[in-house]
């Protein structure tokens, strides 16, 4: 293998909403995080319910095409291929749960896979991240507190105040 561990991060606008739609369409009861301190869960649920009406097949590829975003199948494909020859960390939260759910339908090596995220996701009382991951696949979750509450930079400190919480692989890079 060219690497001991491939770390895959993501950052996509609206990603928690498309992730929620994919998770629900694939049969997982998910409550997802938000990049905002006040999670607009009701709005997300309305959008997802509307999107789910477009689904006309239970085939995973059709589901992702109808309600997902391009990141989900792209990263799931990377996971499927790379986990056969290397360790892979999905560095992220809600969106990586959707990647894992899709990958569980197309195949990947669970033994070489881990989720790495921030404690801002795993400690969020409004979501079921840890339970959700356990229902999707038998992969470990690594959760880290990046200590951003002590940052002198307001943009970084905002993560600890409920903004963003994860993104661009933050949990996996710490």
Residue ranges with predicted function:
Residues 1-9, 13-174:
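N-terminal loops that bind phosphate or other acidic moieties
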